Amino acid sequence: MGKITTWNDARIQALNPGVALPAAKITTVNRSDGSGTTFVFTNYLSQVSSDWKSKVGADKTVKWPNASASVGGKGNEGVSSNVQRVANSIGYVEYAYAKQNRLAYTQLQNRAGKFVLPDDSTFAAASNINWAQYPGFAVTITNMPAANAWPISAA
């Protein structure tokens, strides 16, 4: 919501002890088109931030906060291209695209308080639910309670 604006913010530094972070402004890169990736990402943000939920919400397209510090990109290609082009930026793409294109990604702290990387095992942990409770073909499995769950998952 624009509360952390530089990479060396004390809250980021506390999560990265011993890492020299630049005193540079953060530019966020988001999807400029509607996408399921945006829905899953904003659904997660809505679950972990009541501020995000009340002001932005979860959808395939949203009005991104702090627009002056963000750049839009069409599709995974546009987002990844802008992240690579714009210094000190961060964005989101689907895991398969990141893996196929050898993009860097981060660990996230999940609901259980554990820092995990996105991979097959953390996706499996997130999807380890009672599927009988979810009629239909899709379920949002963001921020699941499993100890090793990747927090931004969908099935």
Residue ranges, per PLM feature:
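Flexible loop/hinge segments at secondary-structure junctions
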Residues: 1-155
